[in-house]
Amino acid sequence: MNLNNKTLIVTGVSSGIGAEVARLARFQGARVIGVDRHEPQLTLDSFFQADLGDPASIDALIEKLPVQVDALCNIAGVPGTAPVEVVAKVNYLGLRHLTQGLLPRIAPGGSIVNVASVLGAQWPERLELHKALAMTETYAEGQAWLAANPVAQETCYQYFKEALIVWTFQQSQAWFRDHSVRINCVAPGPVFTPILGDFVTMLGEERIARDGARMKRPAQADEVAEVIAFLCSDASRWINGVNLPVDGGLAATYV
């Protein structure tokens, strides 16, 4: 696995998995352009502040980014304790808007990696809804569809991670065929990051305790970052349209 001389855009770069991806990629010789609402505490080649839930902010960001990059790592996200409108904007609509805007700039052989979640595993149960949302082409159309098909606060995090997985699947073959760009998801389980406590609030202590009994421990952020870096590298050049669990086997315990 080698990222030498590649240019990566990493969102959510200021903490957690995003920060670890940036550190690892730079160690491997990549140029890393970070994006976040907050200033990072690590060395990057470039950094841009942006609100990834606001299409105007995303459009302004795209204007500042290089004309050619090798990979986009969509890591920024908010927990389900945020209002449902914010979860929709940051975890799905904004991510999609940024990715669509950058697709023409991603070099042939390039890669897009979306961070989903083990909590998105139930996407088959709402497949038709997720496919209908994926068929909306713009941020505004997606907002209008969601206004007509409201999502419950209690399950909004799961819903939009499911939707992200389905959207990734649906884009993968056409983008690979027409642009030679791969797009994949990684699906972490619990990870030691600043928002881990939000998941206790969101899911409840009983669910957290049950999952805790099924797994050895939460992941360290670097354990997920290494998988993302692999998916950005040429070593993964024939991996496309997958949702790769990075959960220490947690999902397998539900079979």
Language-model segment annotations:
Residues T11-R23:
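N-terminal Rossmann NAD(P)H-binding glycine-rich loop of SDR-like oxidoreductase domains
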Residues P79-G80, E85, P108-D178, P190-F192:
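Catalytic loop of short-chain dehydrogenase/reductase
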Residues R126-T136, D178, V191-A213, T253-V255:
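A glycine/serine/threonine-rich, flexible loop-to-helix segment
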Residues L42-A56:
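Rossmann-fold cofactor-recognition segment
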Residues A116-S117, R182-P194, C232, P245-D247:
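Conserved SDR Rossmann-fold cofactor-binding beta-strand/turn motif
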Residues R177, R182, I239-G241:
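Short, small/polar-rich loop/turn modules that mediate ligand/substrate recognition or access, typified
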Residues H97, Q153-Q158, E162-I165, C185, ...:
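C-terminal helical subdomain
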